[in-house]
C-alpha cells in the first residue's frame, strides 16, 4: 500500500515535444515491470524531476527500499582546488589604505586587457613555432593572444551566426582585408603563422567561438538537462484576445494610418509648391534674359523707345465713379475681392430653407404614392394601411324618410271603438295619431320630421332594417315622466359596434388611474364613516345604560339633604 500511495498523490505531467517517449517490444515486458516498480519508489525523492535519474541517487534509494545492507554510496563532486599552490604564500596580504578610492581614470575595458586566454594546445603550438623562428623574432604569449583575439573579433563581426549554420571558416585573405590602422604591426607579422592553428581549433570546436562565453539555449533536447545553460526561456502565457482588444487595435491602426496619410499628403503638397516655385523662378530668369537681349538689340539698332515693356507692369485699377447726388459710403476695412471670385449671394433665411425641404419631401411622397398606385393597377392590396386602397362598394347608411301614399288598415294596437275616423286619401299622404291624441306627439307635414328607415347587412348576409320614430315635442302640461318613457323606445341593433382603442394609451391610463384613486378614496371615506357611526352607537348605548342605573338608585331610597350622588363607573 505504501508503494502505490505516492502514485495516487502525483499528477501525470503533460506530454511535450521535448520529452522522449520510450517504445517497448514484446521481449521487454519483464524489464518494463521492474522499471514501473522503480518509478513507484522514485515518486517522493525530494529532488527535482530532472535529477531523479542520477545513478548514485537511484542506488541509494533502491538500497533503502530493498532493505539490504550495501556500502555507503556517495555522490562524487569535483575538487574545488585544482592545484596545491598556496596563494597566501605567493601573494602576501600587504595592503595600504589609499588616500582616495580613484587611483586612475582608465576604463574597465582598458584594464581587462586581451579577452583571449591561452590553453594547453596553444602553449604547445607556440613553443613549436618559436623553435622554428629566430630568437629576436619569436612570439610572446601576449602577442599570440592578441592575434587569436583579432581572428575571433573579425569572425564575430563578419559571421555573427557562424555557429548556427554551416558557414565556412573565413579565409586568410578576408582576415587581411579587416586589418586597419588600429591593428598592431606584430599582429600583421604573426597572423599568417598563427592562422592555420586558429583554423584547426575552430573546426574542431564546430566553428564556434574560442572565447569563453555564456551558454544559451540552442533548441536542442539536451538543453533541459544541461546545467550550464543560462537565461532559459520560460513558457509565456498567450494573451487572451477579445473583441474589445481587437477593436482597440483596429482603432489605433486606423488612427496611425490616417496620421501617416495626412503627413504624406502634406509632404506631397509642399513638394508641389516648391516645384511650382522652381518653375516660376526658371520662367522669370528666361524672361529676364530675353528682356536683356531686347534691350541690347534696341541699342544696336538705335531704337529710341520707352522701356516700359521691359518692366513688369501692374494693371491700374479703374476708379469707381460715384453716382451724382449720392452720399459717399463710409470707408470699410475689407479685403479686396479676388478677380476670379463670384458675386456674393443673398442671405437665405432658415425658415425658407426648412420650408423648401418640407415641400421637397412632400413632393417626393406624392410622387412615390402615384408610382405605387400605378404599379398596383389591376391588383388589390390587402396590407395594413395600403398606399392605394382597394375601391369598396359604398353603402348609403343615411336614413331615408318613409312617404306613405296609402294605409289600407288601421294599426292593430288600436281598438275599433277608440279608433278615430280616418279619411283615406288615395292621392296624398295619410296623417294619423295615436292614443295620446293632441296631448302626445304632434306630427308635422315637414319631410324631415317624418319616420325614417335604414337598411343594412349584418353578419351572415342578414338584411336588417332600422327605424327612427317621429321627433317628439313635449308640451307644458305633459308630465315629464311620461314624456321620458319614449326616450329610449327603439330597438337595439343585433350587431354590437366594437370601438377599437389602445388600452395602453396615456389618456386612458390616466383616466383609469384617476377612477381607481377616486374609488379607493371613496371606499376609505365610507370605512371611516362606518367606524365613526359604530363608535357613536356604542357611546349612545353606554350612556343609556348609565342613565338607567342612576334612575333606579333614586327610586329605591330617598336620601336626605346634603347627600352626595354616586359617581358613575366608566
UniProtKB/Swiss-Prot annotation:
The keyword Nucleotide-binding appears for this protein: no
Pfam families in the record: EPL1
Compositionally skewed regions (Polar residues) per UniProt: 543-557
Annotated keywords: Cell cycle, DNA damage, DNA repair, Nucleus, Transcription, Transcription regulation
Chief site of localization: nucleus
Any Gene Ontology biological process: DNA repair
Region entry Disordered, spans: 541-570
Family membership noted in the UniProt record: Belongs to the enhancer of polycomb family.
Subunit annotation: Component of the NuA4 histone acetyltransferase complex.
Name of the protein this chain belongs to: Enhancer of polycomb-like protein 1
Amino acid at each position: 500500500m505504501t508503494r502505490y500511495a505516492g502514485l495516487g498523490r502525483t499528477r501525470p505531467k503533460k506530454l511535450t515535444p521535448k520529452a522522449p517517449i520510450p517504445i517497448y517490444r514484446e521481449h521487454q515486458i519483464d524489464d518494463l515491470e521492474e522499471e514501473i516498480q522503480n518509478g513507484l519508489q522514485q515518486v517522493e525523492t525530494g529532488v527535482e524531476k530532472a535529477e531523479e535519474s542520477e545513478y548514485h541517487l537511484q542506488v541509494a534509494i533502491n538500497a533503502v527500499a530493498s532493505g539490504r545492507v550495501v556500502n555507503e554510496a556517495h555522490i562524487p563532486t569535483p575538487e574545488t582546488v585544482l592545484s596545491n599552490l598556496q596563494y597566501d604564500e605567493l601573494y602576501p596580504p600587504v595592503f595600504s589604505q589609499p588616500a582616495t578610492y580613484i587611483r586612475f581614470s582608465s576604463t574597465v575595458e582598458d584594464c581587462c586587457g586581451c579577452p583571449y586566454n591561452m590553453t594547453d594546445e596553444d602553449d604547445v603550438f607556440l613553443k613549436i613555432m618559436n623553435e622554428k623562428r629566430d630568437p629576436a623574432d619569436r612570439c610572446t604569449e601576449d602577442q599570440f593572444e592578441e592575434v587569436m583575439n583579432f581572428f575571433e573579433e573579425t569572425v564575430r563581426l563578419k559571421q555573427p551566426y557562424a555557429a548556427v549554420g554551416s558557414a565556412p571558416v573565413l579565409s586568410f585573405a578576408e582576415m587581411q582585408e579587416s586589418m586597419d590602422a588600429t591593428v598592431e604591426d606584430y599582429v600583421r607579422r604573426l597572423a599568417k603563422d598563427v592562422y592555420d592553428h586558429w583554423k584547426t581549433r575552430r573546426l574542431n570546436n564546430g566553428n564556434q567561438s574560442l572565447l569563453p562565453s555564456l551558454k544559451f539555449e540552442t533548441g536542442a533536447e539536451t538543453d533541459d538537462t544541461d546545467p550550464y545553460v543560462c537565461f532559459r526561456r520560460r513558457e509565456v502565457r498567450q494573451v487572451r484576445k477579445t473583441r474589445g482588444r481587437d477593436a482597440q487595435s483596429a482603432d489605433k491602426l486606423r488612427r496611425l494610418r490616417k496620421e501617416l496619410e495626412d503627413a504624406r499628403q502634406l509632404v506631397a503638397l509642399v513638394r508641389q509648391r516648391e516645384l511650382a516655385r522652381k518653375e516660376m523662378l526658371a520662367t522669370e530668369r528666361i524672361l529676364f534674359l530675353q528682356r536683356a537681349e531686347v534691350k541690347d538689340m534696341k541699342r544696336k539698332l538705335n531704337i529710341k523707345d520707352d522701356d516700359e515693356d521691359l518692366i513688369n507692369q501692374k494693371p491700374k485699377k479703374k476708379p469707381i465713379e460715384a453716382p451724382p447726388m449720392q452720399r459717399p459710403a463710409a470707408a470699410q476695412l475689407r479685403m479686396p475681392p479676388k478677380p476670379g471670385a463670384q458675386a456674393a449671394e443673398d442671405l437665405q433665411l432658415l425658415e425658407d430653407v426648412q420650408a423648401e425641404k418640407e415641400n421637397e419631401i412632400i413632393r417626393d411622397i406624392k410622387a412615390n404614392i402615384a408610382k405605387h398606385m400605378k404599379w398596383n393597377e389591376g391588383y388589390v392590396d390587402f396590407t395594413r394601411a395600403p398606399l392605394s386602397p382597394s375601391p369598396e362598394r359604398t353603402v348609403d347608411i343615411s336614413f331615408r324618410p318613409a312617404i306613405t301614399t296609402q294605409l289600407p288598415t288601421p294599426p292593430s294596437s288600436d281598438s275599433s271603438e277608440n279608433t278615430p275616423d280616418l279619411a283615406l286619401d288615395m292621392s296624398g299622404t295619410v296623417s294619423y295619431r295615436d292614443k295620446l291624441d293632441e296631448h302626445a306627439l304632434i306630427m308635422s307635414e315637414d319631410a324631415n320630421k317624418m319616420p325614417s328607415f335604414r337598411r343594412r347587412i349584418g353578419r351572415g348576409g342578414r338584411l336588417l332594417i332600422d327605424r327612427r320614430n317621429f321627433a317628439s315635442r313635449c308640451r307644458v302640461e305633459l308630465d315629464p315622466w311620461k314624456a321620458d318613457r319614449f326616450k329610449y323606445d327603439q330597438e337595439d341593433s343585433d350587431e354590437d359596434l366594437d370601438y377599437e382603442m389602445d388600452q395602453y394609451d396615456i389618456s386612458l391610463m390616466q383616466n383609469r388611474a384617476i377612477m381607481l384613486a377616486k374609488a379607493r378614496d371613496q371606499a376609505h371615506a365610507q370605512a371611516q364613516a362606518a367606524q365613526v357611526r359604530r363608535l357613536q352607537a356604542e357611546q349612545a348605548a353606554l350612556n343609556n345604560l348609565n342613565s338607567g342605573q342612576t334612575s333606579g338608585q333614586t327610586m329605591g331610597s330617598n336620601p336626605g339633604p346634603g347627600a352626595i350622588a354616586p359617581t358613575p363607573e366608566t
